Every structure is written in C-alpha cells, then in structure tokens.
C-alpha cells in the first residue's frame, strides 16, 4: 500500500530448518484473497503443528542443492501441491510448456526436468532422510547444550520440529564477526554467514523505500548471525571442539 503496489500473493520462507508461521500467513492471505507459495529450500523435512512442510499452503517449493537438508550432488528441486490444476501446469512448464502431445506446446515453458543421476541419488538419500533428520537434532542439541550460556542459540517453538539446515548463532554485540570467523578458520572450522545483505538493501528492492528503522531487527541480525558446521554425521568430539573454540574466542 505504501508504494501503491497491488499485492497478489505471499512467498513465505522457511529459514535455517524452520518453517514460517504458516497459520498466520494463510489466515492473512485468505482474508485478503492472496495466494501463498512456501519456499521450503531450508525447511524441507520439518514439521509445523504435526503437519509436514509441503502440505501447509497452495504450493511449496524446495531445493535439492547439495547444501540443503535433502541434497543431491548437483542442482534440482521440486514442487508440492494438492491442486490438480496447478500440478498439471507445473508439469507442462517443466517440459517446454508441453501439452498432451509431445510436440504440442500450450504455454511458455522451460527445460526443468530433474536429471536421472540426481533422481537416483535422491531416491537413495530419501530412504535415510528421516534418520538423518534425527541425527541433525542430536547435533543441534549438543551445540545448544555447549553454547547456550555464551551466545544466543536458536529458538525452536514447541510446535515445530526443525530440519536443522543450519545451526545459526547470534554473537554478542562486542564481538567482531569477521574476526570471529577468521579465528575459527585458523582452527580449520568452516562457517557461513546467512545473509550479510538483507533483501531490502538489495539493488532490485531499493525502489520500495524501506528505511533502516522499519527493519532494524533485520539489519541487526544480518550483522550478528553466523552458522556453524551442521550435518548429520558430526560426532560429539567434533562438536565439542568447535564449541570450545567458540567459547575461547568470546571469553578472551
């Protein structure tokens, strides 16, 4: 409204393994006649109020990029919907806009088929996906046990089971994040920053005139969050080593 733009839909985004507050988003969308597409690239595998991500709105998209909870060895992704019409259109768009006949294109489409090798890898990984989610929870619990008195650790509401795409901590205000990251790098501990430049500061969105004051929490988090190593096969010894180095830097 502020920028005289007619909103037609909402793209909700799961982050670090947790879905967005989908009940509130769906309620708002229904009241305002909007569609909802959920970006579950980082939250695939998680649950929200005993419902699996992928079943929470009109359409859910996910990514099979290697860094995601269910990752292939290359690029890939999928859509989830209970709407037969949307599913039919998506299948058509995936293959050049194809209609019922192979050489009859009924809409503008693309080449977006998942290649056979990635599909085979995903089928094998899907068989162990639930177990890997449980292992990620064990890793997260150990990190939290080690670090909850020294940094701000992730908060997970009781009605959410996270897929722990990342384990992201908030550093104390007096800590220089670049120095912290360089210190861990010197100890052969990789880290990642998601995301140093918020969406409203990206060039394509500057035309919307969003002030820093309006999104001051976003700005603060973009400068203070950092993600520690996270995958299902981190053992306790490694987690404790990483945790001890985090504690050592912050205390000293």
Protein language model annotation of sequence segments:
Residues 1-72, 78-80:
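Active-site phosphate-binding strand-loop segment of PLP-dependent enzymes
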Residues 1-3, 9-13, 18-24, 31, ...:
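PLP-dependent aminotransferase class I/II
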Residues 74-75, 117:
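A conserved catalytic-core signature of glycosyltransferases
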């Amino acid at each position: 409204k502020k920028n005289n733009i007619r909103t037609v839909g909402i793209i909700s985004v799961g982050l670090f393994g947790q879905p967005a507050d989908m009940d509130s988003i769906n309620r708002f969308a229904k009241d305002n006649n909007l569609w909802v597409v959920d970006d579950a690239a980082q939250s695939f595998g998680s649950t929200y109020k005993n419902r699996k991500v992928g079943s929470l709105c009109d359409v859910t998209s996910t990514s099979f990029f290697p860094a995601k909870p269910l990752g292939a060895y290359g690029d890939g992704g999928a859509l989830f919907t209970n709407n037969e019409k949307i599913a039919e259109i998506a299948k058509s768009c995936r293959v050049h806009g194809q209609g019922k006949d192979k050489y009859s294109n009924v809409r503008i489409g693309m080449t977006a088929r998942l290649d056979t090798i990635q599909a085979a890898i995903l089928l094998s990984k899907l068989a162990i996906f639930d177990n890997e989610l449980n292992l990620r929870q064990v890793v997260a619990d150990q990190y939290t046990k080690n670090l909850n008195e020294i940094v701000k650790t992730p908060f997970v509401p009781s009605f959410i089971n996270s897929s722990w795409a990342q384990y992201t901590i908030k550093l104390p205000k007096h800590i220089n994040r670049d120095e912290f990251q360089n210190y861990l790098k010197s100890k052969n501990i990789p880290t990642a920053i998601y995301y140093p430049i918020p969406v409203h500061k990206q060039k394509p969105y500057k035309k919307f005139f969003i002030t820093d004051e309006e999104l001051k929490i976003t700005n603060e988090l973009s400068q203070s969050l950092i993600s520690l190593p996270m995958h299902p096969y981190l053992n306790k010894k490694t987690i404790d080593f990483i945790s001890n180095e985090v504690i050592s830097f912050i205390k000293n």
